[in-house]
Amino acid sequence: MFEQTLTSDALVTTTHNHAAEPTQRPLRDSVQQALRNYLAQLNGQEVIDLYDMVLSEVEAPMLDVIMQYTRGNQTRAAVMMGINRGTLRKKLKRYGMN
């Protein structure tokens, strides 16, 4: 569904610029455009569980990139994400990344 990639530079820029101007949101803009494209391709078909679908499309690659960046260090990855380690472990298990 989402065919756009997030570079590590973009992730770092996005992370460090929480107070960035509204026009400087490459990740948000990419997700928004991908959603528009997806909905346009539906041709009026009903969508069920869109929230869960979008979340998994964003969350799984994010977890993959962060786990690579931290070289598998779950504690460091959890701190980076602002979640506790147990939550991270559940998410990794959900996507078969444990």
UniProtKB/Swiss-Prot annotation:
One function term, GO molecular function aspect: sequence-specific DNA binding
Quote the InterPro entries the UniProt record gives: Fis_DNA-bd, Homeodomain-like_sf, HTH_Fis, Trans_regulatory_Fis
> Which keywords appear in this protein's UniProt record, sorted alphabetically?
Activator, DNA-binding, Transcription, Transcription regulation
Q: Which regions of the protein are recorded as binding DNA?
A: 74-93
Q: Where are the transmembrane segments?
A: none
Q: What does this protein do?
A: Activates ribosomal RNA transcription. Plays a direct role in upstream activation of rRNA promoters.
Fill in the subunit field for this protein: Homodimer.
What name is this protein filed under? DNA-binding protein Fis
| UniProt lineage | Bacteria, Pseudomonadati, Pseudomonadota, Gammaproteobacteria, Aeromonadales
* Encoding gene, per UniProt annotation: fis
